[in-house]
Amino acid sequence: MAGNKPFNKPQTDARDRDPQVAGIKVPPHSIEAEQSVLGGLMLDNERWDDVAERVVAEDFYTRPHRHIFTEMGRLQESGSPIDLITLAESLERQGQLDSVGGFAYLAELSKNTPSAANISAYADIVRERAVVRDMIAVAHEIADAGYDPQGRNSDELLDLAESRVFQIAENRANKDEGPKSIDQILDATVARIEQLFQQPHDGVTGVDTGYQDLNKKTAGLQRSDLIIVAARPSMGKTTFAMNLCENAAMLQDKPVLIFSLEMPGEQIMMRMLASLSRVDQTRIRTGQLDDEDWARISGTMGILLEKRNMYIDDSSGLTPTEVRSRARRIFREHGGLSLIMIDYLQLMRVPSLSDNRTLEIAEISRSLKALAKELQVPVVALSQLNRSLEQRADKRPVNSDLRESGSIEQDADLIMFIYRDEVYHENSDLKGIAEIIIGKQRNGPIGTVRLTFNGQWSRFDNYAGPQYDDE
C-alpha cells in the first residue's frame, strides 16, 4: 500500500461485481499499485513520462482507473497541470466524474499517496499484471476457437494461437525499448569496438562468408541484419545460400538454422555432401559412385557428425510466427545461432493477409527483420525476381526487380543478386563465373564481386581469375 489509510473502492465495472466471476477466479491485478500510480501523478506531474513509457490506459484493471489515467493524459497533452481540481473538472466535462467515484475518491487518491518516489515500480506492477491478464484472455480466445473453429483447420488454429501469444510478447518488448542515454549507447559501442579490436585483423566483423572478396565488401554477414539473396531461376541462389550456411557451420561455434520451404531435407543434404566433398551431385543423386567418391563423402559425413552444427526444417508454407518460435527454440537450446537461412521468402504465408499479397509480403519481410534484430543473428532470405528483367538487353538485376520489392528493399540491410552471363549467352566469355551484385548495403559499399561457379559440385568458390572492376 502507498499509505497507511485504506482506499475506498470506487464504482467498478461488471467484471468486478459479477459474483460468478468472483466465485471462480479473479484476474491478477493490484488495486493498490494502480491507486499509487494515479495518486503519484497528481503529486508530481513531472513523473508522467516515466509512467507513460511503462503503461497505457488499458493496463489498468478497473474502468474508473482507466478513465482517470486517460483524462490525465489529456491534461498532460494540453499543458494543463494534473491535480485534484483540474482532474475533477476535466472528468466532469466528460460526464465521468461520478462513475470514477466522484471528487471524494480523487481526493483519497491524492491524500493517501504520500510520495511519488516509487511510482515507476508501481507502474511496473500494473504493467506486469496487465500482461498476465492478456495471456489469460488469449488463452480463453484460443480455447473458444478450438471449441468453435468456424471452418478453420488445426494448422490455422495453431497459427492463430501462436500469433496472438506472439503479439503479447511483441507488445511487451516494445514497452521495454525506447530512448537510451548517449552514455549507455557509447558504453556499448566502445565495448563492441574493443571486442572487434581483440579479433584477428582480417576485416571480418560478422559471420565469415567463406569468400575473400565478398568479405572485403561486407566485412561478413552482420548480426541483426536481414540479408536478401535474389536471382532468376537457374542462377544458383539456393546453392549460394547453402554455401554461406556450410561455411558458417564449419567456421562458427553456434549452429546454423535452415528453413527449406521448397526442397526436402534429403535433397538439401545431397547438395551439401556434393559441395563439401566435391563430388558430382548427379552421381550422388543417382548412386553411381566409385570408391574415391565414397571416401570423400565418408570424410565429409564424419566432419558434419562431429560438428553437429546445423538444423534443417523442411516444413512447407511456414508463417512468420512459426519461423520465429522454431528459431527461438533452437536459439535457447544452444545459447545462440550463427545464421538463419530461409529458402525462399515468397513461400512463407500469413493466413490473415492471404487476400492481399503486397501486405502479406510486407508482413513477412518485417517479421524476418524483427527476428534478426531480436536474436542478434543474420537472417538470409532468398527472394524471387520479376520476369520483366528478361525483356532488358542487360539482364543484371537491380533492386526494383525484386518481386513485391517495396517492403523487401526497405527492410533489407544487404541485398545480393546473383548473375551468370552464361545462362543467357551460351558462348559467353564469362563461363563458370558468377557475379554477386550488391544492390544495397546499409552500412557499406555497393558493387560487384566475382565467384567461380562449379555447378557439378553445387558450389561457388573464390574467384582466382584476372582483375575486374568491382564498382
From Swiss-Prot:
Annotated stretches, region: Disordered: 1-22
GO cellular component: cytosol; primosome complex
Highest taxon, organism lineage: Bacteria
Keyword GTP-binding on entry: no
Binding-site positions, ATP: 231-238
Alphabetized GO MF terms: ATP binding; ATP hydrolysis activity; DNA binding; DNA helicase activity
InterPro entries (alphabetical): AAA+_ATPase, DNA_heli_DnaB-like_N_sf, DNA_helicase_DnaB, DNA_helicase_DnaB-like_C, DNA_helicase_DnaB-like_N, DNA_helicase_N/primase_C, P-loop_NTPase
Top-tier EC class: isomerase
Gene Ontology process terms (BP): DNA replication; DNA replication, synthesis of primer
Known catalytic reactions: Couples ATP hydrolysis with the unwinding of duplex DNA at the replication fork by translocating in the 5'-3' direction. This creates two antiparallel DNA single strands (ssDNA). The leading ssDNA polymer is the template for DNA polymerase III holoenzyme which synthesizes a continuous strand; ATP + H2O = ADP + phosphate + H(+)
Record keywords, A-Z: ATP-binding, DNA replication, DNA-binding, Helicase, Hydrolase, Isomerase, Nucleotide-binding, Primosome
UniProt cross-references to Pfam families, sorted A to Z: DnaB (PF00772), DnaB_C (PF03796)
EC number(s) per entry: 5.6.2.3
Domain SF4 helicase: 200-467
Family designation: Belongs to the helicase family. DnaB subfamily.
Role this protein plays: The main replicative DNA helicase, it participates in initiation and elongation during chromosome replication. Travels ahead of the DNA replisome, separating dsDNA into templates for DNA synthesis. A processive ATP-dependent 5'-3' DNA helicase it has DNA-dependent ATPase activity.
Description of how the protein assembles with itself and partners: Homohexamer.
NCBIfam families xref list: DnaB (TIGR00665), PRK05748.1 (NF004384), PRK08006.1 (NF005945), PRK08840.1 (NF006458)
Protein name from the UniProt record: Replicative DNA helicase DnaB
Organism of derivation: Salmonella typhimurium (strain LT2 / SGSC1412 / ATCC 700720)
